[in-house]
Swiss-Prot record:
PANTHER family the UniProt entry points to: DLTD N-TERMINAL DOMAIN PROTEIN (AFU_ORTHOLOGUE AFUA_8G00380)-RELATED, SUPERFAMILY HYDROLASE, PUTATIVE (AFU_ORTHOLOGUE AFUA_2G16580)-RELATED
Pfam families per record: Abhydrolase_1
Coiled coil: none
Annotated GO MF terms: transferase activity
Outcome after substituting residue 115 to A/S: Impairs catalytic activity
Subunit relationships: Homodimer.
Name of the featured protein: Polyketide transferase grgF
Originating gene: grgF
Top EC class of this enzyme: transferase
Function: Polyketide transferase; part of the gene cluster that mediates the biosynthesis of gregatin A, a fungal polyketide featuring an alkylated furanone core. The PKS grgA synthesizes C11 and C4 polyketide chains in the presence and absence of the trans-enoyl reductase grgB, respectively. The polyketide transferase grgF is then responsible for the fusion of the two carbon chains to produce the furanone skeleton of gregatin A. GrgF first undergoes a conformational change to an open form, and the active site Cys-115 is acylated by the C11 chain.
Keyword Zinc in annotation: no
SUPFAM superfamilies: alpha/beta-Hydrolases
Active-site residues from the entry: 115, 240, 269
Length: 294
């Protein structure tokens, strides 16, 4: 992708629960379709998505990219406390705010999410029919983790709740350990955090214990059937280990028409951003054009 000369501005909006979420607006050159983008698990808006937002901006789509609650520039305490249901609700508030922008055709607002953001995007699209289309890229489907870690996580969560009632600070765990494992037993690439540091992406390597308590009660498979009749596209790397390919395909099977699947041959969770990303994004643009008529 080439460097963009189009503008980017700082924006903020208020959620129903009184928080201010802050992000970036990538305005297209004229009024038309719009895209709200959601980053990965415990990730700020800076991670990977700005270049993709610029690409869509250059192709006539106004994009909104913001830090989720408790991350980066956005409000929310405790910090790094991730709640899928709450993030989906905040996407509803983002739509409410975004549709008032003079550059945005309120009938052509789509959602786009990466990894955990893909999960949240699917959930928000299931319940908010103001959304015209949804794209989930390498979505994290099962966030409950290794069953052997369930009881230790719950015990930590109960200890944390009791301690906080006594005035203690929230309990945190490393987001990613040196070997690439995360607290619930799932495995990420060991080089992920060092790579983000080299790229200058400000990811805090910590996450609240309560994040994993909340994840144990969240199952996207219970809601994806309600996305229809909103058109949805799933973009699945063939060799995804971080968000297993088979989980993504199983989720796609649970979804109803209209739906489209784009399998990225030979690609892992994030390495699709290197190489021929243009063709991948062009297929997503074609999906949006066909279903949002622009």
């Amino acid at each position: 992708m080439t460097a963009s000369t189009l503008p980017r501005s700082d924006v903020e909006f208020t959620t129903l629960d009184g928080l201010t979420l802050r992000g970036w607006l990538f305005p297209a050159s004229q009024r038309g379709p719009a895209l709200i983008m959601s980053p990965g698990f415990n990730m700020p808006k800076d991670a990977i998505l700005p270049d993709i937002a610029k690409w869509f901006q250059e192709h006539g789509i106004t994009c909104l990219l913001y830090d989720p609650r408790g991350i980066g520039a956005s409000d929310g305490e405790p910090r790094n406390d991730i709640d899928a249901r709450q993030q989906a609700e905040h996407l509803h508030d983002a739509v409410t705010w975004f549709k008032e922008n003079p550059l945005v055709n309120e009938k052509q607002i789509a959602l786009w999410g990466l990894c955990f953001g893909g999960n949240v995007t699917l959930a928000a699209a299931a319940f908010d029919k103001r959304v015209a289309a949804a794209i989930a890229v390498a979505p994290l489907i099962d966030s409950t983790g290794n069953p052997e870690r369930r009881q230790p996580i719950l015990e930590l969560a109960m200890h944390d709740r009791a301690s906080r009632l006594d005035g203690e600070e929230p309990m945190y765990l490393p987001y990613v350990n040196e070997d690439g494992s995360i607290p619930n037993g799932l495995q990420l690439a060991a080089e992920m955090m060092p790579a983000l540091e080299r790229l200058g992406i400000p990811v805090e390597n910590r996450i609240s214990v309560q994040t994993y308590y909340k994840s144990l009660s969240w199952n996207i498979l219970n809601v994806v059937q309600y996305i229809s009749p909103t058109p949805a596209m799933m973009v699945t790397p063939e060799l995804d280990v971080s968000c297993p390919t088979e989980d993504q395909l199983n989720c796609f099977e649970h979804m109803k028409e209209p739906k489209e699947l784009d399998i990225l041959k030979g690609k892992g969770h994030l390495d699709w951003v290197f190489g021929d990303v243009e063709s991948i994004l062009n297929r997503q643009l074609d999906f949006l054009k066909r279903h949002m008529a622009f």
